[in-house]
Design a protein with these regions (language model features):
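Bacterial N-terminal signal peptides that target proteins for export
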Residues: 1-7
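N-terminal signal peptide c-region/cleavage motif recognized by signal peptidases
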Residues: 15-17
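Extracytoplasmic copper-binding redox domains, predominantly the cupredoxin/blue-copper superfamily
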Residues: 20-221
Length: 221
């Protein structure tokens, strides 16, 4: 599977009269190993400086369900746009206490086995780190972005954006194992021609997996 792409909206007039471009983004670590669950976002290059605007976000919000099974959150990282909702489902045989200290959206749910929380609306852009107050190794990240195009990489470290208009773009990458409180990695001014298929690579320096070496401070986004 080539990643689960969440396209936040494409302005139809940008694509009119031109064949769409395609951009494949691959993310690896410094050893060249593929990095899954990296969030890739794309915006128009220098949109504000040039007086232009990014394509508007799609109007209909969606509901995402994060499962808890085998003492793990699935998916580990999920991508949202502002206005989307999230619900947590407990598919385990034990109780979970789902919580976040994030200033963007602090919350907590105590979920008995087989129970799904009420949907919770995510209004602000940013990253929300979520844990279980009973099982410290359980960690989940909600990435809320108003970028026109956003997706997370698959297990091969790859995501493909199709139907992009011709133009210049800034491509950003974020992953939970990057050092916290630092900006996303970015490659600016990536130019795509109509009908062009292009590949772009990012190599990340990553911290140890916090699900295996839990650090409560690392979750405070």
């Amino acid at each position: 599977m080539r990643g689960q792409i969440v396209i936040f909206g494409i302005l139809a007039s940008l694509c009119a009269g031109a064949t769409a471009a395609e951009l494949e983004v691959s993310v690896t670590d410094r050893r060249g190993e593929p990095v899954g669950d990296a969030v890739v976002t794309i915006v128009l290059h220098n949109a504000a400086a040039n007086g232009s605007r990014n394509p508007p976000t799609r109007s209909a919000p969606s509901l995402h369900v994060v499962d808890q099974k085998a003492l793990a959150f699935t998916p580990y990282v999920e991508v949202f746009r502002p206005g989307d909702q999230v619900a947590y489902r407990n598919s385990d045989r034990t109780r979970h206490h789902v919580y976040s200290f994030s200033p963007i959206k602090p919350f907590e749910f105590v979920l008995a086995p087989g129970v799904t929380s009420a949907p919770m609306r995510l209004e602000r852009s940013g990253v929300i780190a979520v844990g279980c107050n009973i099982h410290d190794g359980m960690i989940n990240y909600l990435y809320i972005s108003d970028a026109p195009w956003a997706a997370r990489t698959d297990e091969r470290g790859v995501v493909v954006f199709r139907d992009l208009p011709a133009g210049a773009f800034d491509v950003r990458v974020w992953q939970p194992r990057l050092p916290p409180k630092r900006p996303d990695l970015v490659q600016s001014g990536i130019t795509l021609r109509a009908d062009e298929r292009r590949s772009l690579g990012f190599a990340l320096s990553l911290l140890p997996d916090s699900r295996l070496q839990f650090d409560r401070e690392h979750t405070r986004y």
